[in-house]
């Protein structure tokens, strides 16, 4: 990183020119975004500056905090010092700010839509594995109660959570009860047992079978019906609502069936195509969901950041349209 391997080439060449010319102007670099968002990646950006700048001791840095709500054009990071000391790092700190702010903002929005219900962060399979650690931390700061991989949970010393998956059920020849029994038998009791119940497209029937077999050991069931299917319990009720996928009527059917047989303790988790809008619809209708598993929608959108030199040797020197903007919320980084 310090040598510029991951940096846009023109930053590498800019530093090379300054070093060869022995020209070390003290600049003020101002970083901002253009959207209302919840900030992420600041801790990483600071770590990059501390570990990869040529001389951290020559820099003065001010920043907001991960999780802070930010306005368009608000300065989130301010760097002062010899430009050659950190010139090649711009690509890197802007990249982590953009990535983690996107994940954190999307997660915060679904968390707010779901309140007081819980949100589980489940998009690991939708992107490269190398982004998991920081993404998980951004989601954690944004309010997700759990993540699906140990890597995502590593920055705060936790571990991934999950359910009995479709693949394990298939490995036991489609027997959801048997797969769940094996989970209960072979996994620690400290691990909450949550089972996917849509393998046979009969969420009510499967939920009841699993609940009867496992009793208090069953923490919850997860409904993940595909958008192209109509669950068996919904077919007789069709006509006045969208019947496909995970819909309010299906969730109510499962909740009512479990309650009738005394399984009020069993939680219901829903997943599959959930967005801010769909969660809001569920909450407005009072759908008896206990938690939402949200995946690919948490990687959508653009939350880009821009860095500009706005002062040189303490005097205004930015390109047209860019000027120093003070932000009293910034705090000095030690």
Q: Language-model segments: which ranges?
A:
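Flexible, solvent-exposed loop/hinge segments and secondary-structure transition points
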Residues: 1-84, 92
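A generic structural signal for alpha->beta connector loops
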Residues: 58, 116-119, 190, 265, ...
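Alpha-helical scaffold domains
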Residues: 30-31, 127, 299
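Buried, small/hydrophobic-residue-enriched core segments of structured protein domains
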Residues: 35, 68-70, 77-261, 276-277
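A generic structural signal for well-ordered coil/turn residues at beta-strand boundaries
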Residues: 25-27, 217, 305
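Gly/Ser/Thr/Ala-enriched C-terminal appendages of enzymes
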Residues: 1-13, 21-23, 34, 38-40, ...
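Structural motif
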Residues: 64, 198, 269-271
